[in-house]
Structures are given as C-alpha cells and as structure tokens.
C-alpha cells in the first residue's frame, strides 16, 4: 500500500503508543522524521530516539517519556500542513501553540526547526505540525 502522508503516519504512531503508555515505538525512518525526532528530544517531549539500519530505509525507534505518576508528557500532536493542503507562514505570522506552552515544527529553507527558533532567525516556512 502506498503511503500518501508519512509524517502524519509518524505522528499517529507516536500518539497511539503514547495513549496506551508504550515505552517505545518503531517507525520507518526518513531525514524529515529524524529531524522531527531530534526536535522532540531537544524540547523534552521524548526520552531519546535511535536509528536502526535495516538495509532498506531504516527504522527509527522512539523512546517515549512519562511523568513520575505516568502522566503523559505529550498531550497532543496535530498535523497542520498536509499533502492536499499545504500551510505556510511568513516570519511574522508563525503560530504560537497554547501561548508558548507547545511547539510548532516548521520546515524552513535552513532546515526543520521549532517556531521559536524560526522566529529568532527571522524565517518562515511550511508549518508541519503542532505538539503540546
């Protein structure tokens, strides 16, 4: 079966594993997914991730993070720009997620970054997703 939106699949797998308190989740890898996983790690939404070479495209193993009483660190994930409807934002129109409590992941000409970093560097781009 052909996958039309691999990033939405990536976010859905993380969301589903998070809802049932899985320790880790494995997804097919790509450069964009690795960049998003790196941002999630830097922002403290996941414990860690690792890339596993399998002779094809590789696998990305993501270790989810929970609080001391099994509180979910990731409350929600939402895909914004989809293959059928791309969403772009100029540098002064970058969205704030929950008044700054969440992050928006933006694909800019200088790579994939958070909305805060893109705002600081004065860059706009495609709004990939919101995470809070």
Curated annotation (Swiss-Prot):
Keywords: Ribonucleoprotein, Ribosomal protein, RNA-binding, rRNA-binding. PROSITE patterns: RIBOSOMAL_S8 (PS00053). InterPro entries: Ribosomal_uS8 (IPR000630), Ribosomal_uS8_CS (IPR047863), Ribosomal_uS8_sf (IPR035987). Disulfide bonds: none annotated. One of its GO terms (molecular function) is rRNA binding. One of its GO terms (biological process) is translation. GO terms for cellular component: ribonucleoprotein complex; ribosome. Part of the 30S ribosomal subunit. Contacts proteins S5 and S12. One of the primary rRNA binding proteins, it binds directly to 16S rRNA central domain where it helps coordinate assembly of the platform of the 30S subunit. Belongs to the universal ribosomal protein uS8 family. This is Small ribosomal subunit protein uS8.
């Amino acid at each position: 079966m052909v996958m039309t939106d691999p990033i939405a699949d990536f976010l859905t797998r993380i969301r589903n594993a998070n809802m049932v308190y899985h320790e880790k989740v494995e997804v097919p890898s790509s450069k964009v997914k690795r960049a998003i996983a790196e941002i999630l790690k830097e922002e403290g939404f996941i414990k860690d991730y690792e890339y596993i070479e399998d002779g094809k495209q590789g696998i990305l193993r993501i270790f989810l993070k929970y609080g001391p009483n099994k509180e979910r660190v990731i409350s929600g994930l939402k895909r914004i720009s989809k293959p059928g409807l791309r969403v772009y934002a100029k540098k002064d129109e970058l969205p704030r997620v929950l008044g700054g409590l969440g992050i928006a992941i933006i694909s800019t000409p200088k790579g994939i970054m958070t909305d805060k970093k893109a705002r600081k560097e004065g860059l706009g781009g495609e709004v990939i997703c919101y995470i809070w």
